[in-house]
Amino acid sequence: MAAFIKDSFWGQIIYRLSGRKLFRHNDELPDYVVPEKYLLDPKEEVLNSSDKSQSSENKEQTEGDQATIQNEPASEHIIVTWDGDDDPENPYNWPFAWKAIAAMQIGFLTVSVYMASAIYTPGVEEIMNQFNINSTLATLPLTMFVIGYGIGPLFWSPLSENSRIGRTPLYIITLFIFFILQIPTALSNHIAGLSVLRVIAGFFAAPALSTGGASYGDFIAMHYYSIALGVWSIFAVAGPSIGPLIGAAVINRSHDADGWRWSFWFMAILSGVCFIVLSFSLPETYGKTLLRRKAERLRKLTGNNRIISEGELEDGHKTTSQVVSSLLWRPLEITMLEPVVFLIDIYIALVYSIMYLIFESVPIVYAGIHHFTLVEMGATYVSTIIGIIIGGAIYLPTVYYKFTKKLLAGQNVTPEVFLPPAIFGAICMPIGVFIFGWTSSPDINWFVPLIGMALFAVGAFIIFQTLFNYMAVSFKVEYLASVFSSNAFFRSVSAGAFPLFGRALYNNLSIDKFPVGWGSSILGFISLGMIAIPVFFYLNGPKLRARSKYAY
């Protein structure tokens, strides 16, 4: 764990405050041998290489050197890379246990902030009574939080890929602000103030959502990345699913009209614990940031200012207009010009929105029809977690045999390998919605609608995973942050807006004994139509990629 603390948020601060004496790296230890390339003047190296030929032995040594030299007169840099393929400071070379610990920490962060969206739901009735407002206004803080973490990725995703910043400082600083915001939120006495605080909290919760999956890719090889992304997504989807149960439990335990406030006190405690743990133990994982720090250390060690990292070169050449473009314009441009991104954004936004509408309909079914207590009603949301686990049990082996195993065997794999499972998930989702809607009746056992919720979760999870991976392997790496940030924006804004009219949708279409039947049917029929999207990609994917300037 000492290695983790060394590259953690506080570890880096202590390192610098101690004058680089504490938490030193391998290249700062007395027995470290500086590679010869870092000691040479690039001009001298260019002259030497042009004046005399090298033996085959020297060529092999040059190919194995840990720095590549750009011979252009304009650059004359020594580019820092890892000390060999087995450099222990390269996150890809971490032992499995280290990778598992880092993955669990990022998963803990994701759950800790992501459950804040739906933990608010059980307190809606109390807020309506206390503030004397209707259900639409009472739902507004939920909407604002979701919209907040939809806007956040447009800003945070590009910053996380700047070598000067990296992943961990962004996680820790925004997590601290998120933690602080829970205090005034819990003390709020007006729905407007509550809504404003929630949208700000959602904005600062966004890095876990927008960058968590990318962090897994920093230390997990491409062959296994699809599986790792599936594991991270279980954390991401489990957060909103267990939020209502925890919210119901803390509200019920408070025994007063202000019980809803305890949802936010709980979030303050949880995010505070998460901040303390991760700020001391979550290491930096972004390779370009780690190499930038290494370049700084080598410049100090050797006095050679020509030593530079790839990240420093990239960031130094970006103009203000390029930064603004990557932050705001490129995600919009890709969404408008790429049919794949546009259609997947619409589909994922629908899936996300239906999930939050189902969360809104649960009180109608289980409090209104079956007369469940607040905690009993909160427990019904566990069915979505069960569905997610089942979806993962289907998806993970499938992607291993259809994608990972073939890559390990050196076979060529096209992105369309993810689409047959996507079609399966697309079929499961509307079936689950119909079952939930038409079995939510006083004449039918309360357990049956939960089967529909679980089946919906199976389909939703598989759709998320397959379509995200389809985009990840279809588009060039330098555009992925924009691709995923546009998707996060679309789905979050849509999911944030849907709950505002969710109650009205169900109430206006309610019939005797089936209060959510026709409302759910509308969602189910729309979902049926959306099955055409993965089918269309399966049939036309190669043609679409061939016409794209952003795709491989």
UniProtKB/Swiss-Prot annotation:
Regions that span the bilayer: 100-120, 137-157, 168-188, 194-213, 225-246, 262-282, 346-362, 381-399, 419-439, 445-464, 477-494, 518-539
CDD domains xref list: MFS_Tpo1_MDR_like (cd17323)
Organism for this UniProt entry: Candida maltosa (Yeast)
Gene responsible for this protein: CYHR
Name the UniProt record assigns to this protein: Cycloheximide resistance protein
PANTHER family: FLUCONAZOLE RESISTANCE PROTEIN 1 (PTHR23502:SF23), MAJOR FACILITATOR SUPERFAMILY (PTHR23502)
Keywords: Antibiotic resistance, Cycloheximide resistance, Membrane, Transmembrane, Transmembrane helix, Transport
Compartments where located: Membrane
Predominant location: membrane
Location of region: Disordered: 46-70
Family under the similarity heading: Belongs to the major facilitator superfamily. CAR1 family.
